[in-house]
Amino acid sequence: MLDLKNLQNNFDEVAKKLKNKKVDENILKKLAELFASLKKEKTALEEFQAFQNKFSKELATAEDKESLKAKLSENKSKINEQSVKVNALENELEEIAHAIPNIPDECVPVGEDEDENVELKKVLNPPSFDFTPKEHFELGESLNWLDFVRGVKISQSRFCVLKNEGALLSRALVNYMIDFNRSHGFEFVNVPFLVNGATMFGTGQLPKFKEDMYKVDDEDLYLISTSEIPVTNLYSGEILASETLPIKMTCYSACFRKEAGSAGRDTRGIIRQHQFEKVELVSITKPEQSDSVFNEMLECASDLLSSLGLAHRHLMLCTGDLGFSAAKTVDLEVWLPGQNKYREISSVSNCRDFQARRAKIRYKNEQGKNELVHTLNGSSLAVGRTLVAIMENYQDKEGKIHIPDALKKYF
């Protein structure tokens, strides 16, 4: 959640940045009106309270006690009425603020959509083939690695069954990713895949993205769309010791997404599924640590791709493509020969204090004051898309898939 004091004190500057993130101008105008109304009503409340405090002290020595009692009683009613007004405005303001995204960092390029993201660099060269490379779903069906028909039969569209070496390769990837991330200083944690609404709110999925979530009927439980949600919230409501920071964690989980806005996109294959697996990096830092830890996380995910021999590129997301909770995001896109283009395989984001304010995660700074931490997250990596990348990059003319050297000991 945004710092409402900063929003109120620097409204024009913040509003300009939020417009670049596609926040409706009418919502920003409504916020400005609410701030003005709240200031007016709070001033009135303070005046009533000041009257009550002053004359309550004088009641014992007042000549006309009954008259003063009546005035104090009337003023108390005004305080109660005014408190209701102030609380209503604060609740309305907070409700709107919950749906407003994070402010983009100064370094984030201004742009409308993914077409205006900025390429930062390429890592490794894509392989060359003396034949036309196939897409992963062709390879997967011919090798009996991917069973789309039975996935749809037991569930619905955008579900798939992994079989034989495809399932084994997926398992090997999970173990390799966890080991790789641990070797880079990230502690492995294993968390529930079902979390409550407060946890979903803490990382910014609720209330804005409620319709995209899978919810358990009659219970305050949601299936997670990323393990960033439970891992970040492990420390919700806590005040951490300064010396424990940064906390760097890695986690494997299944992820569940309705993909409501993806009709017609990636309808074949396992690029976009309702259920998929991911190994995540999550860090909790002091404010002054978050930029360096962001670079560590980005380097970890990029090095992981390089260790598998997968060509990829770094993209800085523009304001129009930036996620709700993120102040800055760099995507890693892996080269897919079958599609002849780069596709997203990881997003590394710095959320600054946006999630920490919602989840109430603080630490005691050197002055002994409680201060909000910064939270960061990133995929290292999306398992299904890494499987796709290996299938397409390591295929041969006969349609067989060769295993990267780094994974051989995991079979």
UniProtKB/Swiss-Prot annotation:
SUPFAM superfamilies found in the cross-reference section: Class II aaRS and biotin synthetases, tRNA-binding arm
Coiled-coil ranges per UniProt: none
Main location: cytoplasm
GO biological process, one term: selenocysteine biosynthetic process
EC number: 6.1.1.11
Gene3D superfamilies on file: Bira Bifunctional Protein, Domain 2 (3.30.930.10), Serine-tRNA synthetase, tRNA binding domain (1.10.287.40)
InterPro entries (alphabetical): aa-tRNA-synt_IIb, aa-tRNA-synth_II, aa-tRNA-synth_II/BPL/LPL, Ser-tRNA-ligase_type_1, Ser-tRNA-synth_1_N, SerRS_1_N_sf, SerRS_core, tRNA-bd_arm
Keywords, ordered alphabetically: Aminoacyl-tRNA synthetase, ATP-binding, Cytoplasm, Ligase, Nucleotide-binding, Protein biosynthesis
Domain of life: Bacteria
GO molecular function: ATP binding; serine-tRNA ligase activity
Associated pathway: Aminoacyl-tRNA biosynthesis; selenocysteinyl-tRNA(Sec) biosynthesis; L-seryl-tRNA(Sec) from L-serine and tRNA(Sec): step 1/1
Class of this enzyme: ligase
Binding-site positions, L-serine: T226, S227, E228, E280, S379
Any one Gene Ontology cellular component term annotated for this protein: cytoplasm
Domain topic, free-text comment: Consists of two distinct domains, a catalytic core and a N-terminal extension that is involved in tRNA binding.
PANTHER family in UniProt: SERINE--TRNA LIGASE (PTHR43697:SF1), SERYL-TRNA SYNTHETASE (PTHR43697)
Name of the protein in question: Serine--tRNA ligase
Organism name: Campylobacter jejuni subsp. jejuni serotype O:6 (strain 81116 / NCTC 11828)
Gene: serS
